[in-house]
Amino acid sequence: MFRRLIGVVVATALLTFQLIVGSATALELDEATRTVPLNAQGDTVTLSLKQVKEGKRLFQYACAQCHVGGVTKTNQNVGLEPEALALATPNRNNIEGLVDYMKNPTTYDGVEEISEIHPSLKSADIFTAMRNLTDKDLESIAGHILLQPKILGDKWGGGKIYY
């Protein structure tokens, strides 16, 4: 009888705590964290919380199969970390650069088009995950890619040592 009473008290305490705390909510990111480079000229844009959430969802849908954790499964030397994006030609360390890449991907040095082997809007007939993505969707995905180093630090694009 006493054990049952203890169990009821503990269950009541846990449920009361749950009501007070509320349901689990996503981490609220401040404006400074959500501000990412817009273009190569240095302009910036602050992503809305909706864009952050949508960018994560779309990245998981269309990109994470090959780029989980910001690495590139097919080429471990080139990931989605800020340094690699900045050294690409043209630069991919901003929203416009990444959107351009998702529309028409090129090799790291920018010399050859690789839309036949990398998902893009240009190759949406081959890579169906890209088929219904809009420019707004691509901007959200790019925002997600640029935001992750601010949240995860070196773990984003860090490779096997972190996963």
UniProtKB/Swiss-Prot annotation:
Q: Name one GO molecular function term.
A: electron transfer activity
InterPro entries with a match to the protein in the record: Cyt_c-like_dom, Cyt_c-like_dom_sf, Cytochrom_C550, PsbV_cyt_c550, PsbV_cyt_c550-like
Cofactors required:
heme c
| Cellular compartments per GO CC | photosystem II; plasma membrane-derived thylakoid membrane
Its recorded name reads: Photosystem II extrinsic protein V
Question: So which residues are the signal peptide here?
Answer: 1-26
| Residues that bind heme c | 63, 66-67, 118
Tell me which Gene Ontology terms the entry assigns under biological process. Answer: photosynthesis, light reaction; respiratory electron transport chain
Q: How does it sit in the membrane?
A: Peripheral membrane protein
List keywords of the entry alphabetically.
Electron transport, Heme, Iron, Membrane, Metal-binding, Photosynthesis, Photosystem II, Signal, Thylakoid, Transport
Family from the record: Belongs to the cytochrome c family. PsbV subfamily.
* Domain of life from the UniProt record: Bacteria
UniProt-annotated location(s): Cellular thylakoid membrane
Q: What does this protein do?
A: One of the extrinsic, lumenal subunits of photosystem II (PSII). PSII is a light-driven water plastoquinone oxidoreductase, using light energy to abstract electrons from H(2)O, generating a proton gradient subsequently used for ATP formation. The extrinsic proteins stabilize the structure of photosystem II oxygen-evolving complex (OEC), the ion environment of oxygen evolution and protect the OEC against heat-induced inactivation. Low-potential cytochrome c that plays a role in the OEC of PSII.
| Record's subunit section | PSII is composed of 1 copy each of membrane proteins PsbA, PsbB, PsbC, PsbD, PsbE, PsbF, PsbH, PsbI, PsbJ, PsbK, PsbL, PsbM, PsbT, PsbX, PsbY, PsbZ, Psb30/Ycf12, peripheral proteins PsbO, CyanoQ (PsbQ), PsbU, PsbV and a large number of cofactors. It forms dimeric complexes.
**Has keyword Chloroplast?**
no
The UniProt note on the cofactor reads as follows:
Binds 1 heme c group covalently per subunit.
